[in-house]
A protein has these predicted regions:
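Conserved N-terminal catalytic core of the sugar/cofactor nucleotidyltransferase
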Residues: 2-21, 28, 42-127, 281-291
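A generic "binding-loop/recognition-motif" signal
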Residues: 25, 36, 74, 210, ...
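Gly/Ser/Thr-rich beta-alpha loop segments that engage phosphate groups in nucleotides
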Residues: 25-28, 99, 171, 217
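Conserved catalytic-core motifs of eukaryotic protein kinase domains, centered on the activation segment
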Residues: 31-34
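Conserved beta-strand segments of alpha/beta enzyme cores
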Residues: 39, 85-87, 201-203
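Active-site regions of enzymes building and remodeling cell-envelope glycoconjugates
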Residues: 84-89, 157-164, 262
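Catalytic-core segments of class I nucleotidyltransferases/pyrophosphorylases
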Residues: 113-117, 122-147, 152-228
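Extended beta-solenoid/beta-helix repeat architectures
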Residues: 222, 226-291
Length: 291
């Protein structure tokens, strides 16, 4: 549908909302996530959650009537980070999974199609800014089928693939499949995606850019290095008097030693004489190898 009554990228006006899933514990990223929720871990000096919200804003999806964020693990930090930018759904008894998180928001979704994004997905397309880079997911959607953003899988027959593609963080769900999701633990793969695939009602929309699932320290480092490009990415408020090579240095950090292919979190310190290589250094002094 297009024309003056159309919403983002051709979707019916008022017919699309978005949910960012930010409730997970990030167990594979521990110990980085022992004090900071995975959704707030910075990539390229920007929290992953803020990257997701910026991508939605690039599609014209903003504000608490249109965008929701769920929270559970260290949820108070997520709530503070979101502020008034989105509707908040706090899961007090632990994360409800991807399906349960959406199911808990049924009254808020209220008949709309819903664009569901994983806060921990890092996406970057040099040909398009955040938002327009995933606009094909919404373009000419029929409002009834399921769409997944994906990229070709190295092994198209591997478990977990959809039509030979690996899921890359965003899906589009019709209300008819959302309205019956219970607010109990469950995942979208089994509750929605596979049944829709079996019914011939699932389509994969290829994503042409880079995707990194930041689930492990190695992948988290890879996402940061991609965000930095061929050089280092240093926040203007950081102090770097040592060496900095292909690294990301956050706000208020101090680097007097030498860092190579590493991430220095906001407020962290690398003392003179220290040499960091392929690690993440946090503000508490924790050093996590990315190998």
């Amino acid at each position: 549908m297009s024309g003056p009554d159309a919403g983002p990228t051709g979707a019916p006006a008022g017919g699309i909302c978005a949910v960012v899933l930010a409730a997970g514990e990030g167990t594979r990223l521990r110990p980085l996530t022992e004090r900071v929720p995975k959704a707030l871990c910075p990539v390229g000096n920007v929290p992953l959650l803020d990257r997701a919200l910026a991508r939605l804003a690039g599609l014209g999806l903003t504000g608490p009537e249109t965008v929701a964020v769920n929270a559970s693990y260290l949820g108070e930090q997520v709530v503070e980070q979101v502020g008034t930018r989105a509707h908040l759904s706090v899961e007090p008894d632990g994360p409800l999974g991807t399906a349960g998180g959406v199911g808990r928001l049924r009254d808020w979704i209220a008949g709309r199609g819903v664009l569901v994004g994983n806060a921990d997905a890092y996406l970057a397309d040099p040909a398009a800014p955040p938002g327009p880079d995933i606009a094909a997911l919404l373009h000419d959607w029929d409002g009834d089928s399921v769409r997944l953003l994906g990229r070709p899988a190295p092994d198209p027959t591997a478990p977990g693939t959809f039509d030979g593609h690996v899921f890359t963080g965003f899906s589009l769900l019709p209300w008819r499949l959302v309205r019956d999701l219970p607010p109990v633990f469950g995942d979208l793969v089994r509750a929605v995606w596979r049944p829709a695939e079996a019914d011939g009602r699932l389509t994969v929309v290829p994503y042409p850019g880079t995707f990194v699932d930041t689930g492990t320290p190695a992948d988290y480092l890879a996402a940061n290095l991609h965000a930095a490009g061929d050089d280092s990415l240093v926040d203007p408020t950081a102090s770097v008097t040592g060496g900095c090579h292909r690294s990301v240095v956050g706000a208020g950090a101090t680097v007097a030693g030498e860092v190579t292919r590493s991430v220095v979190w906001p407020g962290a310190t690398v003392d003179a004489g220290e040499r960091l290589h392929e690690v993440i250094r946090t503000a508490t002094g924790l050093t996590v190898p990315a190998a």
